[in-house]
């Protein structure tokens, strides 16, 4: 019987199943960070248990670490969590990329970089954006702290079999339109709940033409569509990215692995529970204007009024968004000014993202009223960017160049947006208070964020493509 790639990976990992019951899945890779792991390790300690497969477990610290003076953690809770992760990994024999390691970074950036993330794997982490790893043709999803403990002790997890959703985007993207714009356009068209109960497979010409960095951006925000996970079938782009990575198979073993990975594709005749189709030619640079990622518009559009929403609940949420965000109905997106720019997060902090941003700003200066920061997703990204001279472009333009970490994506560290101020952010969530109490977040691509920093407001990057090319 023809199967989707989602069904193939799921079936390969079922340890136990029962009619009408969740399946017990074997987990190939468990990624751990400092925030959701302390209670899980303590649970093991209290029960006298060991980590079942420490070789299948990898930890790093990312959420609440400073990106300036990274070894001086002033927040007491953050300091305790980082210290606990160091002690727990030492006690239970788990690999740890700590603040002194060149392998340290955002967990969803370093997993792929190190070759831990590979096609066909089941991958979990105590973080909702674990779906990022689906870009490799892996089944990857976030779990809660109690589930973290369960995976640590058993290397398995009970899960309800998901429905399958195909999102197909064909055509050719306009210059200046990026992977971030594609996934924001999908969410804008269908809302933040349409993926509930599904795992998404992204198909079509647009995704096939993306780099692995770009595919990770798309899969990262599957969660903002309400989905459990999202993935893209592996191909030559995937295989070449994985080749030679630290923990990937090497030599003949890698070639043998490719033979297996080539089978990880949806069979002809396989059916999805639902299919959504978009035209890539019609996608524009996108900007969120409200308080969830579905409140998003092309940069050359205007904010809708309450009368533009058919449902009363949507009208009420729009009114709340106007008040919180300090915007008004029918205001042009290009008339919105910003005070902060954040280029970083597990969504957009990789080399492709930094190159895109740098290509837009070279030889220009950040607007006087704007504070702009660039936070590489890992120490490896930081070092590579510095080798290419990207940091000089950012610094000369007036950006701050930071150490790796989650940073301003979430207000769990020193990098926050002050109350009532507005940030053009390459992160994945624009909820109320996400970047700080009263902070106003607009989600955009790295290219859009970079140009907002220069102009002090949102501008259409397509207008600048005669001089600046987004790579």
Curated annotation (Swiss-Prot):
It comes from the Bacteria. Its EC number is 4.2.1.33. GO terms for biological process: L-leucine biosynthetic process. Binds 1 [4Fe-4S] cluster per subunit. Its cofactor is [4Fe-4S] cluster. GO terms for molecular function: 3-isopropylmalate dehydratase activity; 4 iron, 4 sulfur cluster binding; metal ion binding. It catalyses: (2R,3S)-3-isopropylmalate = (2S)-2-isopropylmalate. It holds the Pfam family Aconitase. Pathway: Amino-acid biosynthesis; L-leucine biosynthesis; L-leucine from 3-methyl-2-oxobutanoate: step 2/4. The keyword Isomerase does not apply. [4Fe-4S] cluster binds at residues 346, 406, 409. Keywords: 4Fe-4S, Amino-acid biosynthesis, Branched-chain amino acid biosynthesis, Iron, Iron-sulfur, Leucine biosynthesis, Lyase, Metal-binding. The keyword Metal-binding applies. InterPro entries: 3-IsopropMal_deHydase_lsu (IPR004430), Acnase/IPM_dHydase_lsu_aba_1/3 (IPR015931), Acoase/IPM_deHydtase_lsu_aba (IPR001030), Aconitase_4Fe-4S_BS (IPR018136), Aconitase_4Fe-4S_dom (IPR036008), IPM_dehydratase_rel_enz (IPR050067), IPMI_cat (IPR033941). Belongs to the aconitase/IPM isomerase family. LeuC type 1 subfamily. Heterodimer of LeuC and LeuD. Catalyzes the isomerization between 2-isopropylmalate and 3-isopropylmalate, via the formation of 2-isopropylmaleate. This is 3-isopropylmalate dehydratase large subunit. It comes from Bacillus pumilus (strain SAFR-032).
């Amino acid at each position: 019987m023809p199967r989707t790639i989602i069904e193939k990976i799921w079936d390969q990992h079922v340890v136990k199943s029962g009619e009408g019951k969740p399946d017990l899945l074997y987990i190939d890779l468990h990624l751990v960070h400092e925030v959701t792991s302390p209670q899980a390790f303590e649970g093991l300690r209290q029960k006298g248990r060991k980590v079942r497969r420490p070789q299948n477990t990898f930890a790093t610290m990312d959420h609440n670490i400073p990106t300036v003076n990274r070894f001086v953690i002033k927040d007491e809770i953050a300091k305790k969590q980082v210290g606990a992760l160091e002690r727990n990994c030492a006690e239970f024999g788990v690999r740890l990329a700590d603040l002194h390691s060149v392998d340290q970074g955002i967990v969803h950036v370093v997993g792929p970089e190190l070759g831990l993330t590979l096609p066909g794997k089941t991958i979990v982490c105590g973080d909702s954006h674990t779906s990022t790893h689906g870009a490799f043709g892996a089944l990857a999803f976030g779990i809660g702290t109690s589930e973290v403990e369960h995976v640590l002790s058993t290397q398995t997890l009970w899960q309800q079999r998901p429905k399958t959703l195909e999102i197909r985007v064909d055509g050719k993207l306009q210059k200046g339109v990026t992977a971030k714009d594609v996934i924001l356009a999908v969410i804008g068209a269908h809302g933040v709940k349409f993926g509930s109960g599904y795992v998404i497979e992204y198909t079509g010409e647009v995704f096939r033409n993306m780099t692995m960095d770009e595919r990770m951006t798309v899969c990262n925000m599957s969660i903002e569509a309400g989905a459990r996970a999202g993935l893209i079938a592996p191909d030559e782009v995937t295989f070449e990215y994985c080749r030679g990575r630290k923990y990937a198979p090497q030599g003949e073993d890698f070639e043998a692995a490719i033979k297996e990975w080539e089978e990880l594709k949806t069979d002809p005749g396989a059916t999805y529970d639902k299919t959504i189709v978009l035209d890539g030619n019609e996608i524009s640079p996108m900007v969120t204007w409200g308080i969830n990622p579905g409140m998003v518009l092309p940069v050359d559009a205007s904010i809708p009024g309450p009368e533009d929403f058919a449902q009363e609940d949507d009208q009420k949420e729009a009114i709340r968004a106007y008040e919180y965000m300090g915007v008004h109905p029918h205001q042009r997106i290009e008339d919105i000014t910003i005070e902060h720019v954040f280029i970083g997060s597990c969504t957009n902090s990789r080399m492709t993202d930094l190159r895109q941003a740098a290509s837009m700003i070279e030889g220009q200066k950040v607007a006087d009223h704007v504070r702009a920061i660039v936070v590489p997703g890992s120490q490896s990204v930081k070092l590579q960017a510095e080798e290419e001279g990207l940091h000089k472009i950012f610094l000369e333009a007036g950006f701050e160049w930071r150490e790796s970490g989650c940073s301003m994506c979430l207000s769990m560290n020193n990098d926050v947006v002050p109350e009532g101020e507005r940030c053009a952010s390459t992160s994945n969530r624009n909820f109320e208070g996400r970047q700080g109490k009263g902070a106003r977040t607009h989600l955009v691509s790295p290219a859009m964020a970079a140009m907002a920093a220069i102009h002090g407001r949102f501008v259409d990057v397509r207008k600048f493509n005669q001089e600046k090319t987004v790579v």
